[in-house]
């Protein structure tokens, strides 16, 4: 709740600053004289910006299960020893992290895992068969610790709120620019014309791309923190380092020589700005130098 409150206050503060800046520069007076209500537009933009993000968060668990075909393990009747071990491991990690025990699921796919859910005490941790088949139990436990750390850190809520903030500004700025082009450049004086709608569409695309870079940057910072969280829950950084090395195709114990290789959702060059995960080598290097407490 504190995290949500702080982000909402931050969003409100930024909106107020933006509104005040426009008033000082005279943009507010010009647009208002032309029939545009900035206060109303800010409220409209916030509603649009946050509604989609919050709905996505609330639907994240069922959507994740549906999209991956994940099968939730019955905590009272695991089908085999591996499922029993998974349940026990996730529950132990959750207890150490001080959160409610998540649902645990398995899905068919390449080595990967994820955590989702709107609440710390009502989340889902899922792991792929590919990851279970390619890692040792200690490495799998480290990956599970990484996902539990995401839940404990409130990363799903944090990124949802960040997405809501940037969505708000994408919607708001696109319409301000569209109104300016329509009235000041195209000299349309009756309602809004095609120039307004065309400009809004183009601006939403451009601003949306820029906004995704911001969200991706925040996501990468949360990945570093979740790696450190796994090391803390495991009592050692080595299991997570070995798990990352295996995910990146490195030999266990091999030290990275550069930061050029891709991460789990590997990207290079300009596309790296849009990646939700840092490069594997960067994560290993950060974990090796992280202060664990």
From Swiss-Prot:
Family as reported in the entry's similarity comment: Belongs to the peptidase M48B family.
Cofactor detail note: Binds 1 zinc ion per subunit.
Catalytic residue list: 147
Keyword Amino-acid biosynthesis found: no
Top-level taxon of the source organism: Bacteria
InterPro entries reported for this sequence: HtpX_protease, Pept_M48_protease_HtpX, Peptidase_M48
Pfam families, per the entry: Peptidase_M48
Gene3D superfamilies: Metalloproteases ('zincins'), catalytic domain
The UniProt record lists the keyword Metal-binding: yes
Protein name as annotated: Protease HtpX homolog
GO terms for cellular component: plasma membrane
Subcellular localization(s) per the UniProt record: Cell inner membrane
EC number: 3.4.24.-
Cofactor(s) essential for the protein: Zn(2+)
GO biological process, one term: proteolysis
Residues bound to Zn(2+): 146, 150, 223
Membrane topology summary: Multi-pass membrane protein
Parts of the chain that traverse the membrane: 4-24, 38-58, 161-181, 198-218
GO molecular function annotation: metalloendopeptidase activity; zinc ion binding
Keyword list, A-Z: Cell inner membrane, Cell membrane, Hydrolase, Membrane, Metal-binding, Metalloprotease, Protease, Transmembrane, Transmembrane helix, Zinc
Main location per the UniProt record: membrane
């Amino acid at each position: 709740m504190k995290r949500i409150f702080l982000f909402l206050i931050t969003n409100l503060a930024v909106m107020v600053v933006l509104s005040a800046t426009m008033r000082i520069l005279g943009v507010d007076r010009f647009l208002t004289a032309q029939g545009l209500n900035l206060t109303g537009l800010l409220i409209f933009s916030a509603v649009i910006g946050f509604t989609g993000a919050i709905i996505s968060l609330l639907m994240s668990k069922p959507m994740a299960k549906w999209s991956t075909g994940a099968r939730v393990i019955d905590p009272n009747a695991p089908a085999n020893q591996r499922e029993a071990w998974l349940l026990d491991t996730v529950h132990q990690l959750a207890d150490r992290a001080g959160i409610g025990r998540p649902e645990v699921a398995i899905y068919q796919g390449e080595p990967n895992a994820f955590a989702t859910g709107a609440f710390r005490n009502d989340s889902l941790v899922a792991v792929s068969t590919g990851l279970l088949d390619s890692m040792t139990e200690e490495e799998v436990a480290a990956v599970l610790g990484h996902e539990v750390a995401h839940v404990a850190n409130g990363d799903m809520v944090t990124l949802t709120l960040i997405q809501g903030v940037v969505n708000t500004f994408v919607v708001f700025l696109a319409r301000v620019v569209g109104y300016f082009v329509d009235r000041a450049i195209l000299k349309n004086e009756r309602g809004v014309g095609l120039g307004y709608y065309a400009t809004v569409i183009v601006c939403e695309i451009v601003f949306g791309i820029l906004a995704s870079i911001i969200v991706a940057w925040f996501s990468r910072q949360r990945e570093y923190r979740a790696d450190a969280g796994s090391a803390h829950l495991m009592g050692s950084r080595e299991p997570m380092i070995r798990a990352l090395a295996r995910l990146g195709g490195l030999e266990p114990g091999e030290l990275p020589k550069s930061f050029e290789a891709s991460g789990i959702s590997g990207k290079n060059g300009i596309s790296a700005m849009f990646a939700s995960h840092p490069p594997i080598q960067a994560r290993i290097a950060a974990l090796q130098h992280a202060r664990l407490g």
